[in-house]
């Protein structure tokens, strides 16, 4: 404690009390304070000073816990205002003081002055002058200090200040509340809005006692998300500080004790509240971490309203500099190159609910485990009979839902992988099986953390670690927050509802059951299925959701190379290209949704048929890739021609199974040409856009899968290398990419540039137009240009009809067409060409009804009479329909046949 002695003017005069200095740490009451010195390598010494010659009211005191019958003592009138007067004036300020008297018990009484010397404000006089304290009776009246106190008291009485005002001062007595009946409700009632408070006591660096205003709740607040070293209570009642506990406590005390603060109440733990303390000079939670006085704690970091990442970053700052509690910190060794730590890969398979198999750019496969999460598992009453074979996917509650969530989100998609840690291999023990080395990573797609999404749906739980274990997800706090939301909302594993049960019949190899199922599957035609496993290029295990069964499925119509087999006493080697065929089938259909046509079954209970994915026949694809040959049984199938064509092309290339093929000379046969009458050749199309002049744009259904694949690859490429906003300068006629209102990128062509804010674009694959700012445009990557795949939207007009020139009538016709065919599949036949676009007839895919004829029947359009001989039959049908509409006075004809006199006025011609 700093001090300075002031000597008297002459050696014979009375001794002048020594003037000492200190910083006010705490105000105990209206007449007592605690001062401290400057810190020197640790918390400084402290000293209690009681003001001489005055008395202030006693503050409230809670009954001792050891006296259950004891009663709480309330504030005396004006006691709290006196304390507040001193607190606001003195806390954290430098004062000087003189000691006038010291009792045998060690209590020190003296005078306190604000500032560095006794010329400063006399605190006792200020209290008395404000009517917040009284002069003690019985003191010597001729003492100058007493005289000044007496004068101050008389002035306060005259001015009716403080306790000399009218009334008994009951309004200054606080209604202190020491306990809260329902802490959770109390926290929620404040809706995380800052609450004014005074910090009354600091237990350790991260736990304080606070007086909440204006309700005067005296509560214990633990700082959310962190923990400082504490003081361990020994059996003899003494306290032993952990390393840096005293320093952390002083750090918090010197900044917050008896300061006005705001507290955001975030949660509760027993009777203690969790919160964040806000002070004008900063956030104590983050400061403690940054200075190495605290560490993050997982159990409460999720409720920290300002973002757990800020706390983790502050902790990292202290760790990297080995500050205080981190002085012995050793960072985990990084044994991965950057290219191995972060990469983009394609998801090929989902393993249960916490791991995936990905294909790297090098072509290698790698198993990735999702960091810090645990898939659903059997617990308690759910543990099954040991004699029954466990099928985890179907028997563990929510395992199937978790796997399906990942499968639908990820299979065939490119994801971003960030390796968080590598879990070393562990040997088996009596209770735990052996584990090989695991690569644990955070996997994201479209900016979404897959592990976090799983946890938020209650389909996985978060692993709890030791506090010093850094081997965890780089987004661990987000996982904890997601789990808290899932628990609160009762999602998945946290639901109180009955767990879903999946009764899946496995009829693989069960001949009797297979015979029972065969007629149903044959009658069903194409059935939906999920490929669960690929045994070889042509042998798969399928899950049929509608029938809730598992079957073994053999591809019909082909001979696929056999793989290696384990036979009794020997291993039979696989045929050439068997592994390539298996890999091809795996990459194409494993865990994909497919359609199957069951034709028959073999004697082992395996079903035989055709498998289609995205409109492609897997048997044909294997033959195309020269990984299979056509089997003679295909002759009686509807797919024989495409199989033969695919095989012939593969033979010509002399690849793989046809590498040694020698073409046999064939006898040339002259084709006989037959004259046939003209017949309409309708092809399936998908209508994407209807224009205001009743033209429409369609996509060819046969090339639809190519467009889907191109769009998927293009968007993955754009998400990996997004265009720099505003870097693209659009030019008329140029192909580009444009971000539509749905937030997705599409191929487009620039039609007109009014300004950078108004660029007219045409979506070349869908036929719609839009005006966009150039910031929503980008350069079309060459890999997705129209050379790779031509524009998929083709413009057509209806043949044999005239579009109304009247705007209202034309709108009626357009609205009708939009309702009937937009975004639907139809059948299209080109009838004749024109300067603008081909004119066609369009049929509904299901009913085969003529769309244009329907418009005529409804009286929405008129017939365009053409003279060509081949059209006379259809023109007659259209004219008959028009006469029926006229007779019924429908739409255009509601006022009769208007064409006789004013056809020109309305823009019609007969």
UniProtKB/Swiss-Prot annotation:
Residue positions, PTM Phosphoserine: 426, 645, 785, 909
Domain Tudor, residue spans: 729-787
Alphabetical UniProt keywords: Acetylation, Cytoplasm, Endonuclease, Hydrolase, Isopeptide bond, Nuclease, Nucleus, Phosphoprotein, Repeat, Transcription, Transcription regulation, Ubl conjugation
GO molecular function, a single term: RNA binding
Record EC number: 3.1.31.1
Post-translational modification: Phosphorylated by PIM1 in vitro.
InterPro entries the UniProt entry points to: Silence_cplx_Nase-comp_TudorSN, SNase_OB-fold_sf, Staphylococal_nuclease_OB-fold, Thermonucl_AS, Tudor, Tudor_TDRD11
Linked residues for Glycyl lysine isopeptide (Lys-Gly) (interchain with G-Cter in SUMO2): 513
Catalytic function, reaction form: Endonucleolytic cleavage to nucleoside 3'-phosphates and 3'-phosphooligonucleotide end-products
Function: Endonuclease that mediates miRNA decay of both protein-free and AGO2-loaded miRNAs. As part of its function in miRNA decay, regulates mRNAs involved in G1-to-S phase transition. Functions as a bridging factor between STAT6 and the basal transcription factor. Plays a role in PIM1 regulation of MYB activity. Functions as a transcriptional coactivator for STAT5.
Protein name per UniProt: Staphylococcal nuclease domain-containing protein 1
Biological source species: Mus musculus
Upper classification of the organism: Eukaryota, Metazoa, Chordata, Craniata, Vertebrata
Gene assigned in the entry: Snd1
